[in-house]
């Protein structure tokens, strides 16, 4: 077992005093060929920071295009894709070498990329050119550009790979693209400034956050029709779907709350105060815990889904935004967009009398300027031939 030595630190928060308990941590031993990295886009540094999650150290800083924003990992090959908004292209990173191996030109002002589960295609929403670039990831080339609505923000591919759902912020519509024919199947008038998208595991519905109208739209993907407009809090910016698909959590940035939607019935089950300006969320694989980054209060809220209540508020860096979990889910990774660092929170069972709880700060790692998105990739290095 490797060890990481930490100390006790006191952190003032508001009128109270919160503290993290640090002591000698045991880091897991891994097989020599095992790799696990976090990749972080640094929007104002034009770089990607690579964090080795075996040692929690900066492994490499990779120069990419101008203003990197969106990032995605390929589940079938050891590649990472970085959207460069300022240079209108996508950088392909070989995760085994942690080096850029290709740059793919797309259209104007791309912000987001999604990768099909079979690892064969990438979909990039180009907000400045009102289209979606379809990338053949084996050939590393754009095979088609599909015209959609005004200022598309996201293009999300369904789990079965058959449908791409696009939120068009500029005209309040949702486009459904048929992945086989690479053509728009339906255009759905929805709501004001649609943004984030979540698609159910059974491919039946998509939910879209309407940031301008404090609603979430429910879309039937078979008929291409709007099923419901659900009232939530002000400025819903992010949707977090439980892995089982039963509930959807909405981060209401300007209401300091989350709303929980029952996806089967299209009903809002309740809304709960969670922290100042909740930005993003992530749920554990067993559907038991929700973590929410509170951009305005420099905390991460821990919400127990079974109990239906917040059980902890963890102090992190300045303006926390993007979140990820390690492959084991023993570590929560928090991007602090203003302070330019990665906060690593360890989840473990307390085994000493004076340990305060199951969450503690493991370390904070400096990255680049304005880190905004993070993805984790784990793999076994292939045997040398």
Give a label for each model feature:
Residues 2-385:
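Predominantly soluble domains enriched in secretory-pathway, periplasmic, or organellar proteins
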